């Protein structure tokens, strides 16, 4: 049976491949594939934003090699940044429940 972190890694990888290659390179997300992934898989991150300029800026920031697509490494950097932001947010909350062992 897979541990929670192993399951999380599986979801991270399988989610990328669920959306990549629908329109081109199967190992990269183009702009519309990334937008679909974010809209369906991270709806709280985007909220009700449909601001094309903001999305274009996000795409530009993620696309570190400037090939107009987001590869798996760029996707992982993005998810890591979101995880760090979530961690920083929750560090400000007092522990109300004991930690699981």
From Swiss-Prot:
The keyword Transmembrane does not apply. Ca(2+) 2 binds at residues 63, 65, 67, 69, 74. Ubiquitously expressed. Ca(2+) 1 binds at residues 28, 33. SUPFAM superfamilies: EF-hand (SSF47473). The keyword Coiled coil does not apply. GO terms for molecular function: actin binding; calcium ion binding; calcium-dependent protein binding; chemoattractant activity; identical protein binding; RAGE receptor binding; RNA binding; transition metal ion binding. One of its GO terms (cellular component) is extracellular region. CDD domains: S-100 (cd00213). The modification N6-acetyllysine is found at residues 7, 35. GO terms for biological process: epithelial to mesenchymal transition; positive regulation of canonical NF-kappaB signal transduction. Residues 12-47, 50-85 form the EF-hand domain. It is found in: Secreted; Nucleus; Cytoplasm. Keywords: Acetylation, Calcium, Cytoplasm, Metal-binding, Nucleus, Repeat, Secreted. The modification N-acetylalanine is found at residue 2. Calcium-binding protein that plays a role in various cellular processes including motility, angiogenesis, cell differentiation, apoptosis, and autophagy. Increases cell motility and invasiveness by interacting with non-muscle myosin heavy chain (NMMHC) IIA/MYH9. Mechanistically, promotes filament depolymerization and increases the amount of soluble myosin-IIA, resulting in the formation of stable protrusions facilitating chemotaxis. Also modulates the pro-apoptotic function of TP53 by binding to its C-terminal transactivation domain within the nucleus and reducing its protein levels. PANTHER family: PROTEIN S100-A4, S100 CALCIUM-BINDING PROTEIN. Homodimer. Interacts with PPFIBP1 in a calcium-dependent mode. Interacts with PGLYRP1; this complex acts as a chemoattractant that promotes lymphocyte movement. Interacts with MYH9; this interaction increases cell motility. Interacts with Annexin 2/ANXA2. Interacts with TP53; this interaction promotes TP53 degradation. Interacts with CCR5. Interacts with FCGR3A; this interaction inhibits PKC-dependent phosphorylation of FCGR3A. This is Protein S100-A4. The gene is S100A4.
């Amino acid at each position: 049976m897979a541990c929670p972190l192993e399951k999380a890694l599986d979801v991270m990888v399988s989610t990328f491949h669920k959306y990549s290659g629908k329109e081109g390179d199967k190992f990269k997300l183009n702009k519309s594939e990334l937008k679909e992934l974010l809209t369906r898989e991270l709806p709280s991150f985007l909220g009700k934003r449909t601001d094309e300029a903001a999305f274009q800026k996000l795409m530009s920031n993620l696309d570190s090699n400037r090939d107009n697509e987001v590869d798996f490494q760029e996707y992982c950097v993005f998810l890591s940044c979101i995880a760090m932001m979530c961690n920083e947010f929750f560090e400000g909350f007092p522990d109300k429940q004991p930690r699981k062992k």
